Amino acid sequence: MAIMKTTLTLALLLSLPALAGPKEELSKPLTTIVNSVRYGRDNAALKLFAAEEQGKLLVADSWAKGTDAQRKEFQDLFLTLFGKIAFPKIRKNFENLDTILYDEPAVDGAKASIASTILINHPLKKQELKVKYQLVKQGSAWRVVDVAVLGDSMLIGIRDDQVQPILKEGGWDALLKAMRDKAAELKDVQLK
């Protein structure tokens, strides 16, 4: 009887991850990104971004006009540039990370959003950041599409201030050239 009871208890405990609710399922990749960036595992963090969905949002109507090769190069360059530019700044902010509190997510099929409050316990001042994430389900995994800090969307800012003006001026060729040039400029910044 004791063996049967122990077996049932173990079976229930081992099945708990499979019973994780939407909040846990959606916050897991976010926590992985934060910890990966915080501890210098940049490439692990970049794998949790939905590069194609980001490209569609950034390039907007021009996405369909690009060739498969152009879209692929854009995705690769964007993730590389994002990691090299944003991650060092984020890493610095997360040196004093205290905790992240996630709200209940809003899930609509393969799309979801979840808000969080990031508490930074800096010795000189405590800081509270309100962050909202847009995610998309790819296969069985959730990937991050966009992040809004204090209501400002990262991708919309990049799209409106950088990507769209270059596209309007010179199309895909000019955009990819500008991205290649910026990547060359940042060649000494290593993704970890």
Describe the role of every protein-language-model region.
Residues 1-3:
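N-terminal secretory signal peptides that target proteins for export/translocation
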Residues 6-16:
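Sec-dependent N-terminal signal peptides
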Residues 14, 52, 61, 78, ...:
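Alpha-helix boundary/capping residues
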Residues 19:
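Catalytic domains that recognize anionic headgroups
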Residues 22-93:
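Early exported N-terminus immediately downstream of N-terminal targeting peptides
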Residues 75-79, 83-130, 179-192:
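Surface-exposed, charged secondary-structure patches
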Residues 128-158:
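Short beta-strand edge/turn micro-motifs at domain boundaries
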Residues 147-192:
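Low-complexity, intrinsically disordered terminal/linker segments enriched in charged
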